[in-house]
Curated annotation (Swiss-Prot):
Pfam families per the UniProt record, alphabetical: CMAS
InterPro entries from the UniProt entry: CFA/CMAS (IPR050723), CMAS (IPR003333), CMAS_actinobact (IPR047672), SAM-dependent_MTases_sf (IPR029063)
Primary role: Catalyzes the conversion of a double bond to a cis cyclopropane ring at the distal position of an alpha mycolic acid via the transfer of a methylene group from S-adenosyl-L-methionine. MmaA2 also catalyzes the biosynthesis of the cis-cyclopropanated methoxymycolates. Cyclopropanated mycolic acids are key factors participating in cell envelope permeability, host immunomodulation and persistence.
Name recorded for this polypeptide: Cyclopropane mycolic acid synthase MmaA2
Highest classification ranks of the organism: Bacteria, Bacillati, Actinomycetota, Actinomycetes, Mycobacteriales
Keyword Glycoprotein part of the UniProt annotation: no
Keyword Transcription (UniProt): no
Organism annotation: Mycobacterium bovis (strain ATCC BAA-935 / AF2122/97)
């Protein structure tokens, strides 16, 4: 357990508050910034992102009137889908000012009696009881030293039949890379340092074992783990392709340096997923 549970606002805002207009250049219309799920080969990126959201929500056992907490809610696509498909109330947490403003605007435009809130806050600051929790692409930002606290908080606010769906990038230990026959190259070391310092400051993907062991210690039971590894390589390929197609706009919105940095990040990460250095998994955790 760590004593200071202040959310990592600065680390997250350094990436996600770059510019909504910039992210729109390469994300799909739902503005979902995580691995898509290509159920069919002919799916568009938008269709595959909705399929990923449906895959995650479908594992939660949602019932009308329940309250769903979305930790690291991004631009709100998962919550809007949950309202539309499951008639549930939603609460979203984000550390990004841009995302919070975008989600609030989209909520204000919805015609529904269901309760919908977005808070500029981290899970560390949230103590309300909820029925289900979904977290897609946020756990990587928490830091290894907060895993135990995160699972304890999730367990505390869920009911006896509660479910947490955790979708996160997962990494390998150095020994696991050796065991899998993956070379520990200078390019790999430099690229991982680049990601940690210039793209996702503070980011620390867990290993699969970390998630399973820490969640179990808190009282969660892993009922399913599903890897989407090849799907993330394809997602990143499509993001890189879209950003490249909008190069002049990207440079106008940000700069050539930012454009080149993001192209390096997107193409390099696609390679990591394709080769197998990193994975992405959905963990279904029952209380």
């Amino acid at each position: 357990m760590v004593n200071d549970l202040t959310p990592h606002f600065e680390d997250v805002q350094a990436h996600y508050d770059l510019s909504d207009d910039f992210f729109r250049l390469f994300l799909d219309p739902t503005q979902t910034y995580s691995c898509a799920h290509f159920e069919r080969e002919d799916m568009t990126l938008e269709e595959a992102q909705i399929a990923k959201i449906d895959l995650a929500l479908g594992k939660l056992g949602l019932q009308p009137g329940m309250t769903l907490l979305d930790i690291g809610c991004g631009w709100g696509a998962t919550m809007r889908r949950a309202i539309a498909q499951y008639d549930v109330n939603v609460v979203g947490l984000t550390l990004s000012k841009n995302q919070a403003a975008h989600v609030q605007k989209s909520f204000d435009e919805m015609d529904t009696p269901l309760d919908r809130r977005v808070l500029l806050a981290g899970w560390e600051q949230f103590n309300e009881p909820v029925d289900r929790i979904v977290s897609i692409g946020a756990f990587e930002h928490f830091g290894h030293d907060r895993h135990a606290d995160f699972f304890a908080r999730a367990h505390k606010i869920l009911p006896p039949d509660g479910v947490l769906l955790l979708h996160t990038i997962t990494g390998l230990t150095r020994q696991q890379m050796v065991d899998h026959g993956l070379p520990l190259t200078l390019w790999l070391a430099r690229f991982l340092k680049f990601i940690a310092t210039e793209i996702f400051p503070g980011g620390q993907p867990p290993t699969i074992e970390m998630v399973e062991e820490q969640s179990a210690k808190t009282g969660f039971t892993l009922t399913r783990r599903q890897s989407l590894q090849p799907h993330y390589a394809r997602t990143l390929d499509l993001w890189a392709e879209a950003l490249q197609e909008h190069k002049s706009e990207a440079i106008a919105i940000q700069s050539e340096e930012v454009y080149e940095r993001y192209m390096k990040y997107l193409t390099g990460c696609a390679k990591l997923f394709r080769v197998g250095y990193i994975d992405v998994n959905q963990f279904t955790l029952a209380k």
